[in-house]
A protein has these predicted regions:
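N-terminal leader/targeting and assembly helices and adjacent pre-domain segments
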Residues: 1-178, 271-279
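Acidic, glycine-rich two-metal-ion catalytic cores of nucleic acid-processing enzymes
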Residues: 181-279
Length: 279
């Protein structure tokens, strides 16, 4: 058994990528909120007038901004999937070199082939893709923006009141109350999708590059150890479903982590690490 997880560097890199994605996506929406704040400064907070032309123009501009954010998010997540996959493969190369196998090469074609299983949705055996999911999240946000404006006009709210509600909606630090009829945080769907894609890219690359290694006998499920670990992940770490030990799964039976997951995995092998490096 190896003393240390040979894929620890890739695991740490995955965390860096997820954190970077989170900051970037959140900034997209903060920048949009700043634009609305500028608009609010031009409005009379004491006026009860509802300017439909102004509100429809504001709605149009925000919807265009959401399209831009969608494109940017798609690029960020795609890049995160690719680089995380490559890091796993590089760790595997180091691992194989350490046990005497030097013919393993990490080519751009190999990285793309593995990453595409996640990006195109082949991993999920359904009519799904990263692009369609991100655009779907963007459309839901646009629907919410349109709903805020339409409901405000219907309820005879002032232009300022409606714009203020839009400001609250696009503020990633604010969660609108349930009675508003709109679910927040506004960036939640994009954040959840981004984290899930990188996590699944990490897991898929980990399995693909080790499943045919005869020295790797099984996989071990390891939770993040954080306070918010869900019951399902705790069960996966503690259960001995296959009689191999707690949290240990045959190579063809490692469960795919759930959306927004943060668990990791280790290889199980009887290979003597000390002998390998002293040979």
């Amino acid at each position: 058994m190896f003393k240390d997880n040979p894929f620890k560097e890739a695991e740490n890199y995955r965390a860096v990528v997820i954190s970077y994605q989170e900051r970037r996506i959140r900034k997209f929406y903060k920048d949009m909120r700043t634009e609305i704040e500028r608009e609010l400064k031009t409005l009379d907070a004491n006026s009860d007038k509802t300017d439909r032309v102004y509100l429809n123009q504001l709605k149009f501009e925000l919807n265009n901004r959401i399209n831009q954010i969608t494109l940017q998010t798609n690029d960020i997540v795609r890049d995160g999937v690719m680089t995380t996959t490559e890091m796993v493969l590089q760790n595997n190369k180091t691992f194989l070199n350490g046990i005497g196998f030097y013919n393993y090469n990490v080519s751009p074609q190999l990285v793309s082939k593995m990453a595409d299983k996640v990006i195109t949705g082949k991993l999920y055996d359904g009519k799904w893709s990263l692009s369609s999911a991100i655009w779907g999240a963007g459309k839901r946000t646009q629907f919410d923006i349109n709903k805020i404006v339409s409901r405000g006009i219907l309820e005879h709210k002032s232009t300022y009141e409606i714009a203020k509600k839009l400001e609250g909606y696009v503020n990633p630090a604010v969660r609108l109350p349930v009675q508003s009829g709109v679910l927040g945080e506004v960036d939640y769907n994009a954040q959840r999708l981004a984290r899930t894609m990188v996590q699944h890219a990490y897991q898929e690359a980990f399995v693909e590059c080790t499943k045919d290694n005869p020295f790797v006998e099984a996989y071990q499920w390891i939770t993040s150890g954080m306070s918010n670990v869900c019951a399902l992940c705790i069960e996966r770490e503690e259960a001995d479903e296959y009689g191999l030990g707690a949290g240990i799964y045959p190579k063809d039976a490692l469960p795919l982590d759930h959306p927004n997951g943060n668990c990791t995995f280790d290889i199980v092998t009887t290979w003597d690490e000390d002998s390998a490096y002293s040979a």
